From Swiss-Prot:
Native organism: Xenopus tropicalis (Western clawed frog)
Location of the CRC domain: 513-626
Membrane-spanning segments: none
Protein name: Protein lin-54 homolog
Domain notes for this protein: The CRC domain mediates DNA-binding. It contains two CXC subdomains (joined by a flexible linker) which are both required for efficient association with target DNA. Each CXC subdomain coordinates three Zn(2+) ions.
Lineage: Eukaryota, Metazoa, Chordata, Craniata, Vertebrata
Gene Ontology cellular component terms for the protein in this record: nucleus
Keyword Repeat set for record: no
Length: 741
């Protein structure tokens, strides 16, 4: 297949090479006619998604395009003068020209160079001068119409062997005699922009005897059938790519095709109608099916037209040769850089993550980030990541299905580094699982522990908590994080064991949980809040407008930072442990209370449930052993805790009883399969029972019984009446109970 040389591509104007033409309502249709001798039909190959292809042999086919008159943004009007160069001069009268009404403002080109075809747009049809090239019947004929907006002439370069020297004025279609050998003309119709962005391309076979003018008719046409193909486009159009480049091949041989079929495949946005009519026959409507690219089945391939868009502003198209397609995915390889730490922003997460980025030093290491491709490989064996030995305690949640690997940290001189080996796909990660999947079973992990997920997990990446946070487990699913003063400091979470209720249980007060806080105006973000001071989240507390929870993690971290700015040792334990053998704790430093009497929670001694000592610098202290105020407050605190426990137990018992009542099976509604006893207590039965009771009362009165004896006799009679009703219900299920008193 011969491809048009690069000189032709260079001569083509910019409008042809442009694909991003913005047209608002442009329904213009482009038609390109290519003719070659001794060929009845030529298949067409294109890269477009939809093709309209109509072919016929030996029949006169005329293509009419119906479109609405819409306003275009280009506002160009005028005519297009089509000229071509014949392969050789011929004495027989044969020429063709096509006049298309376009819009104005076109530039004309000077005299064409040898081997070129110049297409100029003129203002009116009368401007077709006598200098137009003559199209001979044995040559190739190219008719180009409606190429969108175009203000420059179109220059086509043909081989020198096909260029003739004869130039005859052509203003109309000349008469074609029947003795001339008919030519095969391919009419390629390229639709303009449509709403779906896919142009329509159609091709039909014509002969030179089938192109006539309105004034002259050929006798040959009187015996031939005429087929009319109409394509209506009324749907609103949008901007899209247009045909930019044509690669036209010469016919390999002049043998006619053995099979000739007509295949139509198109899809218009507005549902156009495609009709094919013959003179003397009723019109037939053909529905247009939305199918893929099809071509004319033929035994031999002679002509091929490959159409490919070029210079697309949004994407680059690479041609495929021999059926080899380019891959549909791209791999992004990170640049080689020193090991560093990058902060990861996870949407919707309250925690801060740090990703350890590897340097691409090894040649066989796998990039840490790739775009998802069609083939994915599971993770290989997870290799350890060595980090610096900073005093950090991490409690990391994992899913039970994953494997946990503990890595002993080693001291390094640099910051966080990663040890890479020769095995590919080495990664360590902490899975970002939701809070509902956090398991409180990793409280005894050493400082600096790094967890690796099982191979085959989805999101792969490093997630390491910063050093200024220490995680704590609260109840069963919450994670409490307390800020650290620095890398060398320790927190209360490392020195005090934690319990399930309210987060913390101190070693001395292990018999009871910490009392709930009662903060009202501090938002639980002050140091005198027990929960906040001990690095806990509030749970089962009596506080109002609490911000010491996961929902307000940002405000909580700001408060922690403010406290650390004022006092770097704010979250350190205020009361240290005593020596071995001593039961009482000692002060790390004394309190400095002045007006609270050391009976408030912001007093270190009172908060730790110990008395003030000589180290304290408090004024008006009441926190000593014989202080009645201290005893009263302690008793009140104990009573409050007991009351809370009792209320919790009562609520739990009540809820369990309610659940038992709801789940208890209902008693059977039928007694022996019949009516229930109370259904027999009708109005008549009630009246008869009352009469029996009155009769029993009269009998007791005649016997001069006492009041108590009379009441006893009446109650006994009432019991006998009820037993009769019950017995009657058991015997007669449908009949009413007859009672005789």
């Amino acid at each position: 297949m011969d491809v048009v040389s690069t000189d032709v591509n260079n001569v083509l104007p910019d409008e042809i090479m442009e694909t991003g033409i913005s047209l608002v309502d442009d329904d213009s249709i482009e038609a390109i006619t290519i003719s070659s001798p001794m060929v009845d039909e030529a298949p067409m190959e294109t890269e477009l998604e939809r093709i309209v292809e109509v072919s016929s042999s030996g029949e006169c086919v005329s293509t009419a395009v119906v479109k609405e008159a819409v306003a275009s943004t280009s506002n160009n009007a005028g005519h297009l003068a089509v000229v071509s160069v014949a392969s050789k001069p011929e004495s027989g009268p044969s020429a063709a020209a096509m006049k298309t009404v376009l819009q104005t403002h076109f530039h004309k080109l000077a005299t064409p160079i040898s081997g070129q075809v110049v297409l100029n747009k003129v203002s009116q049809a009368s401007d077709l001068t006598a200098g137009s090239h003559v199209v001979k019947q044995e040559g190739q004929k190219l008719i180009v119409t409606t190429l969108g907006k175009s203000s420059h002439p179109i220059v086509l370069t043909l081989p020198q062997s096909h260029i003739g020297n004869a130039q005859t004025p052509v203003t109309h279609v000349q008469r074609i005699e029947s003795k001339v050998t008919p030519q095969q003309i391919k009419l390629v119709t390229i639709g303009g922009n449509r709403s779906d962005g896919n142009p329509v391309l159609g091709m039909s076979a014509l002969t030179s005897a089938q192109i006539i003018s309105p004034s002259t008719k050929s006798p040959v046409l009187q015996t031939q059938q005429i087929k009319t193909l109409q394509i209506a486009k009324k749907a609103p159009t949008s901007s899209g790519p247009v045909i930019t480049k044509l690669i036209i091949a010469k016919p390999l041989n002049s043998k006619p095709l053995t099979e000739q079929t007509t295949q139509i495949a198109s899809s218009f946005a507005g549902g156009p109608a495609l009709s094919q009519t013959n003179p003397g026959t009723p019109p037939k409507a053909l529905n247009i099916a939305d199918i893929g690219v099809i071509g004319t089945p033929s035994a031999k391939t002679t002509n091929k037209i490959a159409i490919s868009p070029l210079k697309s502003p949004s994407k680059g198209v690479k041609s495929s040769v021999g059926g080899i397609n380019t891959p549909q995915f791209k791999t992004i390889i990170p640049l080689a850089a020193a090991p560093n730490v990058q902060q990861i922003q996870v949407p919707g997460s309250k925690f801060h993550y740090v990703r350890l980025v590897t340097a691409s030093t090894a040649s066989n290491t796998t990039p840490s980030s790739q775009i998802q491709s069609t083939s994915t490989q599971p993770l290989q064996q997870a290799k350890p990541v060595v980090v610096n030995a900073t005093p950090v305690r991490m409690s990391v949640p994992i899913i039970p299905a994953q494997t946990v690997k503990q890595v002993v940290p080693k001291p390094l001189n640099a910051a966080s580094q990663i040890v890479t080996t020769s095995q590919p796909q080495q990664r360590l990660l902490m899975p970002a699982t939701p809070l509902a999947q956090i398991q409180p079973s990793l409280t005894n992990l050493p400082a600096g522990t790094v967890l690796a997920s099982a191979p085959g997990t989805g999101n792969v990446g490093y997630a390491v908590l910063p050093a200024q946070y220490v995680t704590q487990l609260q109840q069963s699913s919450y994670v409490s994080i307390a800020s650290n003063a620095g890398l060398s400091g320790t927190t209360a979470a490392q020195n005090q064991p934690r319990g399930p209720l309210n987060g913390i249980i101190s070693s001395e007060s292990a018999s009871r949980p910490r009392k709930p806080c009662n903060c009202t105006k501090s938002l639980c973000l002050k140091l005198y809040c027990d929960c906040f001071a001990n690095g806990e989240f509030c749970n089962n507390c009596n506080c109002t407008n609490c911000y010491n929870n996961l929902e307000h993690e940002n405000e909580r971290q700001k408060a922690i930072k403010a406290c650390l700015d004022r006092n770097p040792e704010a979250f350190k334990p205020k009361i240290g442990k005593g020596k071995e053998g001593e039961s009482d704790r000692r002060h790390s430093k004394g309190c400095n209370c002045k007006r609270s009497g050391c009976l408030k929670n912001y007093c270190e001694c009172y908060e730790a449930k110990i008395m003030c000592s000589s180290i304290c610098k408090c004024i008006g202290c009441k926190n000593f052993e014989e202080s009645p105020e201290r005893k009263t407050l302690m008793h009140l605190a104990d009573a409050a805790e007991v009351r809370v426990q009792q209320q919790t137990a009562a609520k739990t018992k009540l809820s369990s009883q309610i659940s038992d009542l709801l789940t208890r099976p209902a008693p059977p509604m039928n007694s022996g399969g019949g009516k229930l006893p109370f259904t027999f207590v009708t109005k008549e039965v009630a009246e008869a029972t009352c009469e029996c009771l009155l009769a029993q009362a009269e009998q007791a009165e005649k016997q001069l019984k006492s009041k108590a004896a009379t009441e006893r006799m009446i109650l006994e009679e009432f019991g006998r009446c009820l037993m009769r009703v019950i017995n009657s219900a058991g015997k007669a299920k449908t009949d009413p109970c007859p009672m005789s008193c």
